[in-house]
């Protein structure tokens, strides 16, 4: 069913929330408010009347930093399981990083991945291509070829861009109008220690300082991944004031947790960059509020059951996040008054859509990528709730509020929380 009449709910559009209905016909949004109500009365075709019961209706979320693990690491996640986790979390578009096996570094690999996506994805998937072949940092990829395939974002995620090839990569990505994402981690500064001591903030902000010089020189669009340190925020603030083409993201775990929340050294708190101090966390929240940080990105990095009992030493980095992102931020920030609901929704829809170059707002005539959010329901996070193969979440055992109840992609129902079965 691609015809829907969503009524008795609040709608987030034009960056405000107000009570109105939404009419979707043929997978397109055709009317809001009184116009939607009147058109529904005149429509004689098959349609699903959905009583939102006071819930919030928003454009589907967009994640610019996901790890779907396929091909090569299907024991951790697959396109099918990862995108099912996405729609369960309210995401209708995800951008998977290229740290797969093989890496997404050639058009042949891209074509194979595109086929897998067509056959298995539950939502829209916009792959991120590698910056260098094999993500080895020595030889750049065919940026023009990838751009012709519709790729916008380029990254060697997990591996910082080597000094010897950095300028060539910035020039190449800039020439095709792409966006370069670098993993900010100066490995020369990585040491030994526990929690955040092992990967100091200097490893992040000093590499960003280098990259910003290349942005000044090349004018390449640049996106700062998973900001974690207050010093990094200061550099981004100055770069934006200077007019550099820079955007930035922050993860839900860095917005809501610090190293002090780690009560025992379990592997599901192991992440890059690490959880830092309360000063850092507050700086990140303030930066998201002010627009210095543009978007929330999940950095969803499932590792399957092999990580669950792991200690920090030897445990792989990354946490499962697609299904807890909205819930954790709504619970820990919105309900506590440190972030507005409108700003949270903006950072998950309009802002990432602008970076990716896709429509991400509820408007007449656009494809109906929609999520309906129950802001009242709360549940304790357990392993059994996850659609993802990974349950390595720092929110296990926490009570979170704000759950997607329905997710539509092009008007097709891809997720219903209460167990209703809809057909497209």
Please name every model-derived segment:
Residues 1-43:
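N-terminal metal-binding scaffold of metallo-dependent hydrolase/deaminase domains
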Residues 9, 311-314, 364-424:
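C-terminal cap of metal-dependent C-N hydrolases
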Residues 9, 22, 27, 54, ...:
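Divalent metal-coordination and catalytic microenvironments
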Residues 38-58:
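Active-site metal-binding motif and surrounding structural segment of the metallo-beta-lactamase
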Residues 53-117:
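Metal-associated gating/positioning segment near the N- to mid-region
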Residues 58, 107-124, 171-182, 324, ...:
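Alpha-helix-loop-beta-strand connector modules within alpha/beta enzyme cores
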Residues 140-296:
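Histidine/acidic residue-rich metal-binding segments in metalloenzymes
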Residues 196-198, 202-219, 289-290, 294-296, ...:
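His/Asp/Glu-enriched, well-ordered alpha-helical/loop segment
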């Amino acid at each position: 069913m691609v015809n829907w009449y969503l009524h008795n709910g609040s709608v987030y559009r034009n960056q405000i929330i107000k009570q109105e209905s939404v009419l979707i016909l043929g997978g397109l949004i055709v009317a809001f408010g009184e116009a939607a109500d009147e058109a529904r009365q005149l429509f004689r075709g098959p349609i699903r009347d959905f009583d939102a019961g006071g819930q919030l209706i928003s454009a589907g979320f967009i994640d610019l930093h996901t790890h779907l693990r396929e091909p090569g690491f299907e024991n951790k996640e697959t396109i099918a399981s990862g995108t099912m986790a996405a729609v369960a979390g309210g995401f209708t578009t995800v951008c998977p990083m290229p740290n797969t096996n093989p890496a997404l570094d050639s058009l042949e690999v891209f074509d194979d991945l595109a086929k897998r996506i067509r056959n298995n994805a539950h939502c829209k998937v916009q792959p991120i291509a590698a910056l260098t072949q094999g993500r080895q940092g020595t030889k750049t990829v065919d940026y023009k070829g990838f751009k012709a395939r519709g790729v916008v974002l380029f990254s060697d995620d997990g591996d910082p861009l080597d000094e010897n090839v950095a300028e060539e990569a910035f020039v190449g990505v800039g020439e095709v109008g792409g966006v370069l994402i670098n993993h900010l981690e100066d490995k020369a500064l990585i040491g030994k220690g526990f929690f955040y001591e092992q990967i100091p903030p200097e490893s992040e902000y000093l590499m960003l300082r280098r990259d910003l010089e290349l942005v000044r020189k090349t004018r390449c669009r640049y996106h700062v991944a998973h900001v974690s340190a207050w010093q990094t925020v200061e550099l981004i603030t100055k770069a934006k004031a200077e007019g550099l083409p820079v955007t930035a993201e922050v993860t839900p775990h860095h917005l809501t947790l610090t190293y002090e929340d780690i009560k025992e050294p379990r592997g599901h708190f192991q992440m890059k960059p690490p959880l830092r101090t309360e000063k850092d966390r507050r700086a990140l929240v303030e930066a998201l509020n002010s627009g210095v940080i543009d978007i929330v990105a999940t950095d969803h990095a499932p590792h399957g059951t092999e990580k669950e009992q792991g200690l920090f030493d030897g445990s792989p980095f990354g946490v499962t996040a697609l299904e807890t992102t909205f819930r954790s931020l709504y619970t820990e920030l919105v309900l506590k008054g440190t972030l507005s609901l409108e700003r949270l929704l903006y950072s998950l829809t309009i802002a990432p859509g602008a970076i990716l170059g896709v429509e991400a707002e509820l408007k007449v005539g656009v494809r109906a990528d929609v999520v309906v959010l129950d802001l009242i329901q709360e549940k304790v996070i357990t392993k059994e709730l996850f659609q993802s193969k990974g349950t390595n979440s720092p929110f296990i055992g926490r009570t979170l509020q704000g759950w997607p109840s329905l997710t539509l992609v092009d008007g097709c129902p891809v997720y219903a929380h209460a167990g209703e079965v809809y057909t497209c």
